[in-house]
Amino acid sequence: MTFGCLVDQYDQLVASSFGSNSRILEKHLTEYSAKTVGKALTRSDHWFTQEMIRRFEGVKNPRDVKLNRDFVSTHQARVCAVLEKIPIGKVTTYGLISNHIGSGPRAVGVAVGSNPWSIFVPCHRVVPGSLAIGNYSICGTLGENGSTTKRRLLLHEAVPIEEDKIDSTALWNPSEGD
């Protein structure tokens, strides 16, 4: 697995992504950079990239990361604010988020699917109302390994999964808080 981050001049995270193909990852982040800050990618030894790997591997007590929110819409920022509150070991649904912020579930789905801060803002903790695992966007596109990656991330966080369904005890409602 290859990991990459895009960081601004203030050491804030602009975007992050990962995937099995380093060329696709670099292309994805380079294109995102051209639309936003025009900065180069971080090196693999940069602390942002190392922190991303730690989180991917399920390490507890993550280091605080400042996000550059200048390049997301107000709607996406509202959705991401909810995502950041989902506790480790829990999931929520597109519908619960949409009810909480007063938006349509499809609009929430678009915001979740275009989350620029992969791993740091846990979009993998959002599942369909059926509590199926669902898919996961890698490098900006849905791939054949998306649901496998999402399952891996959720299992690292001790989300109870039986076959391809999340146990309802892991469901978190943003309107009810923690």
Give the location of each predicted region.
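Short, amphipathic alpha-helical segments
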Residues: 73, 102, 117, 144-147
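Residue-level signal for pocket-adjacent positions within structured domains
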Residues: 60-62, 87, 121, 128-131
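Major-groove DNA-recognition helix of helix-turn-helix-type DNA-binding domains
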Residues: 112-121
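Intrinsically disordered, low-complexity basic tails/linkers immediately adjacent to helix-turn-helix/homeobox/MYB/SANT
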Residues: 125-152
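Basic nucleic-acid-binding alpha-helical/helix-turn surface characteristic of O6-alkylguanine DNA
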Residues: 1-103, 155-178
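A short glycine-rich, hydrophobically flanked beta-strand micro-motif that places a catalytic Asp/Glu
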Residues: 96, 109-110
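Surface-exposed charge patches
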Residues: 81, 110, 152
